[in-house]
Curated annotation (Swiss-Prot):
HAMAP family: NDH1_NuoM. This is NAD(P)H-quinone oxidoreductase chain 4, chloroplastic. GO terms for molecular function: NADH dehydrogenase (ubiquinone) activity; ubiquinone binding. Keywords: Chloroplast, Membrane, NAD, NADP, Plastid, Plastoquinone, Quinone, Thylakoid, Translocase, Transmembrane, Transmembrane helix. One of its GO terms (biological process) is ATP synthesis coupled electron transport. It comes from Cryptomeria japonica. The lineage of its organism: Eukaryota, Viridiplantae, Streptophyta, Embryophyta, Tracheophyta.
Length: 499
């Protein structure tokens, strides 16, 4: 059993199963939903089994490696492997995608294509987190682009084509930099082309080339993460997408940018990373404040949550730039934490819209009494988003603060200023979140909404929300539940020379 190509199986299974969907009878919409949900759940259980019985968590090396020669002419290999950093994001992908599939249950328009696209996106994201070849990394980066574009353009709001096109142009533009960087790294040197991560890490690049490569990759990841000022596609995309797609975007897609920033920029280009790290911290601090202030001015509920996501990603950037063991641990934990919280908030926004048929805060008010379950869950996840102690966001943000403060590479003045700016962002977060809750659920406007007659959450919706809430509480109370996955990997990253 240990010799099976486990990683190839979990990467290929979703998209292969999706190709069978056209064979289902035309009136088998319910069957397609159950089939897709079953495939997602099977893949999640399979990866849980693999990591439980075939992975050694105290080992920082790449494990479960698979290497198959794919295109010999250009030395392109199907090479997969995982370490502690990959595992957390792969499990997050499986968990959020399974719940997003369940969230898409009410969609009745063209369900065959919808569920195939979700499965194709699932494979692309798993493949990216498991890639050990930089060309394969690029291929998987591109694979999820088309499913997301179609999900946005076919199941969205009135401006869905505009937002989908904007997403496509931004992401495709960033992908060019990944391809150029991958080819430059692979072809550099006198030993022939190689795109293997391990071999690329051993190459010694001239500092000028390393800086140029770092900048190119940074632009691509800045679009996906996103990093200010390349973030403008995100509010438009979230504002128009169906909430099941929003769950995948907030829960998984944004984390691809953070993953690339650590996996390629930090691991393969360490000297350039040490030069850029102060600038990452400054940009992250500015982003926290900017996005929080912008969120406060949003009338549209989805756009307010979208800017909240941008603000929270600022902490990830600071943690990556902190150049400390604690800060990087906090950044990875923040990625996982936000994946759960962001997915839950967008699901709640979508279920609220299904009932009251409006996304504008000034048209809401007084809906806490008719839908107390949604009110309770919305309040709970908002508390998680503002990093209430006892929840996952608090631990992650505290570790990031600690990482910045304890890095003596930076002057004490710089550390104090950055900490103060980020702390202001933490003060602004409850302001825009609590204001959102007040305008939605309190007051006397309930009869003014387009649909004043609606029901509270059903069993399916409560199940999704509870599944997302339990790990948030679990990580908040016992962070080692997640930290043990990648502690050894983070130690290995800092064992290399950055200077």
């Amino acid at each position: 059993m240990s010799n099976l190509p486990w990683l190839t199986i979990i990467v290929i299974l979703p998209i292969s199963a999706g190709l069978l969907i056209p064979l289902f009878p035309h009136k088998g919409n319910k069957m397609i939903r159950w089939y897709t949900l079953g495939i997602c759940l099977l893949d999640l259980l399979l990866m849980t089994y693999i990591f439980r019985y075939h992975y050694h968590f105290d080992n920082s090396l790449i494990q479960l490696e698979e290497d198959y020669n794919w295109i010999n002419l250009i030395h392109f290999h199907w090479k997969l492997g995982i370490d502690g950093f990959s595992i957390g994001l792969i499990l997050l992908t499986g968990f959020v995608t399974t719940l997003a599939t369940l969230a898409a249950w009410p969609v009745t328009r063209n369900p065959r294509l919808l569920h195939f696209l979700m499965l194709a996106m699932y494979s692309g994201q798993l493949g990216l987190f498991a890639s050990r070849d930089i060309l394969l990394f690029f291929l998987m980066w591109e694979l999820e682009l088309i499913p997301v574009y179609l999900l946005l353009s076919m199941w969205g709001g009135k401006r869905r084509l505009y937002s989908a096109t904007k997403f496509l142009l931004y992401t495709a533009g960033g992908s060019i930099f990944i391809l150029m960087g991958a080819l430059s790294m692979g072809l550099y040197g006198s030993h022939g082309p190689t795109f293997d991560f391990e071999l690329l890490a051993k190459k010694d690049y001239p500092i000028t080339l390393e800086i140029l490569l770092y900048l190119g990759f940074l632009i691509a990841y800045a679009i996906k993460l996103p990093i200010f000022p390349l973030h403008t596609w995100l509010p438009d995309t979230h504002g128009e997408a169906h909430y099941s797609t929003c769950m995948l975007l907030a829960g998984v897609l944004l984390k691809m940018g953070g993953y690339g920033l650590i996996r390629i920029n930090m691991e393969l280009l360490p000297h350039a990373h040490s030069l850029f790290s102060p600038w990452l911290i400054i940009i992250g601090a500015v982003q926290i404040i900017y996005a929080a202030l912008t969120s406060m001015g949003q009338r549209n509920l989805k756009r307010r949550i979208a800017y909240s996501s941008i603000s929270h990603m600022g902490f990830v950037i600071i943690g990556i730039g902190s150049m400390t063991y604690t800060g990087l641990n906090g950044a990875i934990l923040q990625m996982i934490s936000h994946g759960l919280i962001g997915a839950a908030l967008f699901f709640l926004v979508g279920t609220s819209y299904d009932r009251i048929r409006t996304l504008f805060l000034d048209e809401m008010g007084g809906i806490a009494i008719p839908i107390p379950k949604i009110f309770t869950m919305f309040s709970s996840f908002s508390m998680a988003s503002l990093a209430l102690p006892g929840m996952s966001g608090f631990v992650a943000e505290f570790m990031i603060f600690l990482g910045v403060i304890t890095n003596h590479k930076y002057s004490s003045t710089f550390r104090i200023i950055i900490t103060a700016i980020a702390a202001i962002g933490m003060i602004l977060t409850p302001i825009y979140l609590l204001s959102m809750l007040r305008r939605m659920f309190y007051g006397y406007k309930v009869l003014n909404v387009p649909n004043p007659y609606f029901k509270d959450s059903g069993p399916r919706e409560l199940f999704i929300l509870i599944c997302l809430f339990l790990p948030i509480i679990g990580i908040g109370l016992y962070p080692d539940l997640v930290l043990f996955l990648y502690n050894a990997k983070v130690e290995a990253i800092f064992s290399q020379s950055f200077y």
